[in-house]
Amino acid sequence: IVLLAQVGVKVVLVHGGGPEISQMLSRLGIPSKFVDGLRCTDAESIEVVQMVLAGKTNKDLVSLIGVCGGKAIGLCGIDGRMIQAEKIADKPELGYVGEITKIDTAPILNALADGYIPVIATVGVDDGGMAFNINADTAASEIASALKAENMIALTDIRGLMNDVNDEDSLIPVVKVEEVDALIAGGKVSGGMIPKVRSCEKAVRDGVKKAFMIDGRIPHSILIEMFSDEGIGTMFVK
């Protein structure tokens, strides 16, 4: 990320913090529950989400970028009402999980213009000032589309989409967006992978040229995917 920024690529880092949130909720004795890969978030949990995402994970990432020689600034979707959201009407069981209604790109563009790497914690806000937990993959897609980004890269803990999750050699290197529904219906995409795949699909449908799903655990995976002929993950195209 730092190298890309140093060679002139405008990089925006959008992050969640699912494991960290689950760990903190567990320490506080609050159970974690998920529906279709989305965390059910009650009034108590949304405070923990804000605390962990904006107060801990975000600052850890900003600090790490600084250690690597980059210049980053931490932002939360509430800042400048950057990520405007409302409650998901047809899924009341999710509680304070929001769907995005608008992205205000001004804070992001201002940070980029000043030479910073914006690091964005995905908490949204409604007209009444209520905070909402926003799925990070969904937020990344909406932000990429609003910025008219050329590429969006989703970092995961698997190689990409697989024909057989138990076979490392069954990677699907390229997926056309019209194939996504069939992949989900066929069970090749399930659980927490559904929001990731849908976010890549939506980004491409909304004008992002390419979306990538790659294994973030592989050293330099972003550079390999973007600057090699074969890549190492799954690329989504129209």
Where are these regions (language model features)?
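Nucleotide/pyrophosphate-binding catalytic subdomain
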Residues: 1-217, 224-226, 230, 237-238
